[in-house]
């Protein structure tokens, strides 16, 4: 920390970068216990206009067009890295070497080698380093996890999850870094990494995968004439380039607990902008979650006893993780969404940096490395006709 305050910055001014910027802005207002003063210092992006607009919008002091300016700045302590994952390693290693605490967006890196190097850099730096698996901060998902971990409904038997989006369903969607990088770097890496971490968060570690398929359904895309943010449409040029990675992924997972999982992720799910959901069935119960109804979850437990009872609706509130005194209105029925999760995540990481121990820590770089190994295993299964692949 810089004296008695924490200076924060964000690398990347796209939609996820803006989510981090907004999260840091609101995080100090959560809970009764105070943090040190949080200073909103800088937004960096190679597109200066994007950086300036995001800094203005969220109240940051300045905008930069190079992440190195953040590394060199003595008034910055914490940096979120929210750019294409092919750029993560250089930026993260540079920031850690400069003494910054780093929260890196998922997926942590494009390769296991890069992720291992980032883990080593974090360990050598002695700084806090975390990975942005933001769905761990969902009160409803964390409540389901707690019910399973406590043994209330027994061990998990089957997890069925999906993350379906439609940002790539239009053939006129412009070419971007999301469509480059080879098999495993598309829908699997971009949104599947979230789903995989969520599955392990709820059911424990995955030991092997099989039956993976990584099809590409739109073979080429037009280059944009100018810069585009996130999944936004853009004016297109006459030049096209081939899509190098998958539009969707399906696979089966075996968990260390003995449970089986069926998972799918897609960026070409027509009409579904951001559909994340799962069901988990256990020895004596079940739970279900739908991100479109993020302020609730469905639950079946042994009371009343007997099959056929169906799900009962549970509205999240002060009895569930992260919520007590966490929002101006924290009672059931208020409702929470994905944007709120970035606030909870920012608060947790700031507390880690401040040396506080009141909230579950964000995912570690070691956990981020494990996620990359899982992505590799799924890609290997697909490459080998759906073979069973053990996760290293």
Give a label for each model feature.
Residues 61-67:
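Conserved SAM-binding strand-loop segment of SAM-dependent methyltransferases
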Residues 16, 135-242, 385:
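Predominantly a Rossmann-like dinucleotide-binding segment in NAD(P)-dependent oxidoreductases
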Residues 134, 218-246, 250, 254-255, ...:
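C-terminal glycine/acidic-rich active-site capping loop/insertion
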Residues 127, 154-158, 380-392:
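C-terminal capping/lid region of NAD(P)-dependent oxidoreductase domains
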Residues 54-60, 121-125:
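Short, conserved SAM-binding/catalytic segment
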Residues 78, 84-85, 89-137, 151:
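Beta-strand-loop-alpha-helix segment that lines the small-molecule cofactor/substrate pocket
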Residues 193, 264-273, 337:
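Glycine-rich phosphate/pyrophosphate-binding beta-alpha loops
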Residues 1-58:
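N-terminal Rossmann-like dinucleotide-binding module
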